[in-house]
Amino acid sequence: MFASQHATFNHVWSSLLLEELHRLGVRDIALASGSRSAPLTMAAAAHAGFRRHLHFDERGLGFMALGLAKGSGRPVAVIMTSGTAVANLWPAVAEAQLTGVPLIILSADRPPELIDNGANQAIDQQGIFGRYPVYQQNLPSPTPTIPAAFVLSSVDQVLAQQALTPGPVHFNCMYPEPLYPGDEYLDFSGYLAPLGDWLHSSEPWSPWQQNEQICPRQPDWAALQGKRGIIVAGRIQDPAQAQVVAELAERLGWPLLADLQSQIRFDARNLIHMDLALQNSCFVAELARAEVLLQFGARLISKRLGQFIKQHPWQDYWLVDPQPARLDPDYRLRRRLVCEPAAFAATHKVSTRHLPWHRLAERQQSATRQIRSACDRFSELGVCHRLGNLIQGQLFVGNSMPARLMDMLGEAGKGPSRVMTNRGASGIDGLIATAYGFAQSSEQPTTLLIGDLSALHDLNSLALLGKSSRPLVVILLNNDGGSIFRMLPVPTGDRLLETYYCLPHGLHFEHAAAMFGLHYRAPTTLAEFEQAYTAALKKPELEKKVTLIEIKVPSSEVAEDLKALGAAIRGL
């Protein structure tokens, strides 16, 4: 039953807003402290149906909520105070929009009369996130002249739009003072009475009908099956959906080229080392016999695969992805189907199992032998290769070198239960906070693989890990700066590369781990790494839920190793 007594009209509207969010399925709220957001915070604290997640840094807060939403697959609300606190959510909002993650931003704001007049902690928050929210609404200051149903109806409409186009939505809530309760609560039963049965039910005010996802059968599907095709698997969040893709490739007899984000990167049906094998002319020549491309999920990590797709003269190229966005950076698509893989497979049957048309697995074997040889010592390559064999539970992979190395080097095997990344905007900020949020979605352990600059960007969020209720292992690749730039054609004269790109910092993370109460290891051999990682997943070290394993390597080593490996594969 919805309460009739509240502190102020601000609190009535805040309670209505959060109650309707709960009735529409929201269960997690991320909160940072602040005064202007007091009505929202108090309503969230009083509601027994929410799991509340706290962080003192709004930038990390946004990314934590992003991880919670990615892990749970459900919308997550985020509450923050006014001013630059709101602006700090910008990176997480951009990432959420680009990857279709449902965040609900509830920003507190000054009332209109305190905007643009020199009032403290007041900025123009209307439309602050630009075009990145899929829907945004500026709620007026609460007043008895606006019916309570307006608040409920607004929530219903915005979340219906979010269901149609997954991504962030933004409610800007303009609260005048008073923001806190007085000596006694007031009775608002007269104001709430027009809501009728809603006050005593658990149903939303005006739920919108959602259409079931159906993928119409393409009339030329039968003809496409008869061609030499390949299946590329990009970002697929649901492992069950990914298995549909692997089974479809198997029935068609088409090679499967699966990205790290596909949930089937470690599947034996995948050409597991295709990225590095694309440097070999025999492998490329065999792959180039393909006539058509069927891709599930976008945002590929492998630049070499992206270049092959861009340059190959496809007879046809279809992309299946549930996000209703243009995902065609090279303008090569000929068919765009907005649905999940299972919906596509339900209407696009493969009547008979086809024999493979290719010998790509055979062509890949020599590259695989070179990879295993290059990964047999303690290095970034060696650690990432060994991690692929050791990993238990979930994997969150940071951007820059970690994502590329895991995409290149992983072996076929059990692999992680789920893989998650932030590959929308592909920033190196907020990765620790996102991984923490992602870890909260599962009782399984979560491993975060991250670089040193990414860790420095989000050092505040180590505070989240110190209070984690889930086992989490951080593997931190410390090559003293931005070593990925050594892979790019940056001029090396006059120390330009070192001074302006790699930015060596000379820092290590043992004291950071101690400050935030994390267990710390710094192995120097692959055997020590394996022992440290397996121990971090077991008791008694789980009494400290999080272990930080720092991998200290020379700055130029990873670039030199990859260049040598590439040369060896090209020479096969």
Curated annotation (Swiss-Prot):
Cofactor note: Binds 1 thiamine pyrophosphate per subunit.
Pfam families according to UniProt: TPP_enzyme_C (PF02775), TPP_enzyme_M_2 (PF16582), TPP_enzyme_N (PF02776)
Record pathway: Quinol/quinone metabolism; 1,4-dihydroxy-2-naphthoate biosynthesis; 1,4-dihydroxy-2-naphthoate from chorismate: step 2/7; Quinol/quinone metabolism; menaquinone biosynthesis
GO molecular function, one term: 2-succinyl-5-enolpyruvyl-6-hydroxy-3-cyclohexene-1-carboxylic-acid synthase activity
Keywords annotated in UniProt: Magnesium, Manganese, Menaquinone biosynthesis, Metal-binding, Thiamine pyrophosphate, Transferase
Entry's EC annotation: 2.2.1.9
Cofactor: Mg(2+); Mn(2+); thiamine diphosphate
Catalytic reactions on record: isochorismate + 2-oxoglutarate + H(+) = 5-enolpyruvoyl-6-hydroxy-2-succinyl-cyclohex-3-ene-1-carboxylate + CO2
Keyword DNA-binding attached: no
First-level EC class: transferase
HAMAP family given in the database record: MenD
NCBIfam families, sorted: menD
Summary of subunit composition and partner proteins: Homodimer.
Family per similarity comment: Belongs to the TPP enzyme family. MenD subfamily.
PANTHER family from the UniProt entry: 2-SUCCINYL-5-ENOLPYRUVYL-6-HYDROXY-3-CYCLOHEXENE-1-CARBOXYLATE SYNTHASE, PROTEIN PHYLLO, CHLOROPLASTIC
Function: Catalyzes the thiamine diphosphate-dependent decarboxylation of 2-oxoglutarate and the subsequent addition of the resulting succinic semialdehyde-thiamine pyrophosphate anion to isochorismate to yield 2-succinyl-5-enolpyruvyl-6-hydroxy-3-cyclohexene-1-carboxylate (SEPHCHC).
Protein name: 2-succinyl-5-enolpyruvyl-6-hydroxy-3-cyclohexene-1-carboxylate synthase
